[in-house]
Amino acid sequence: MIEIFQVKDRKTLKEFVRFPEVLYTNCPQYVPNLRMDEKAIFTTSPCLDYCKLKMWIVKDGKRVVGRIAAIINPRYNKLYNVKRVRFGWIDFEENIEIAKLLLDSAEQWAKEEGMTEIHGPLGYNTWYKQGMLVEGFENVPQVNCIYNYPYYKEFIEKLGFEKECDWVQYKLPPTQGVSDKLRRINDMLLARYPLRVVDLNVIKKQDDLIERFFDHYNETFKRVHNFVPLTKKEIDVLGKQYIKLLRPELNCFVMDDQGRIAAYGICFPSLSEAYQKAKGRLFPFGWWHILRAYTKYSGIDLMMVGADPAWQSKGVSAIFHCHLADNFKGKDLKYSITNPQIEDNSAVKVWDSYQEKEDYMRRRCYIKTIK
């Protein structure tokens, strides 16, 4: 008999965090999170300052067979004038009754809190993993992306959820270069306007530049579906750690003569295989696998691209595309994977300028009215 339990203590939190490792034991595509990072999400995240969080696990006897987290983000609801609860970190064995019990529990709590809709999978905000995998199950995801079995999609649609939006990802040969059109735009912009590429090491050493970048991030992404701007504390805790992990040769920040960030392209060494080898543990040897992949890499994750609205119409993104393409020349790089991008985001169209690209994964946010 299956029963649901709210996560309230260290024991149930441990079961919640470790359940996917059991569920995906024999899945070669699955990339486990580091346990310490996963626990921190639910205990010390700065998002908990304003978000409401509930978590559940489902057990069959003593065995965990499912999990889910439900989040109410009042900043999101106010920004979009809605009453929505987010569900995330949802995993379950191939039994629709488990999925139903998890989602019903999240819906019931949301109803008690006055919410009228439920959507997900989503995290506290855009900084966290989001989107249920609906295409590309044969591929290995990036470390910041969700992987799930194909039956998730089938079950959640049977339970009355519908598509809200999709994110798409592409696989590209990183050494293919850029189109002649992008190169011409790059040359024209650098000749006509006071734009320059800034050394990443300079940005890392100046907190004001990092804060300026995240102000720019909040501004450039505010038109993207479901985006929630980062707070000052989130920038201090999450953002600054992230920037300081970036490698100079894989990133490009473009600034104007006023010291404003005009555009950026952020990439990261692919760490998926290293995380698989670490098996959720940083010690005793997980750190070594991750450090080695960080310094000796053959794959790249194209994590984030953005352009200031004032420069976007001029095609400023061509500068970081050309800069990174030049950096990649001559390197022994086998592949690059784009980060999930909302399918109606105009930034997705830039990948059409690359002659060689293939569909890699598609993710979906589902939504349902709470009755």
Residue ranges of model-derived segments:
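Short hydrophobic/aromatic beta-strand or adjacent loop that forms the aromatic wall/cage
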Residues: L53, C165-Q169, Y360-C365
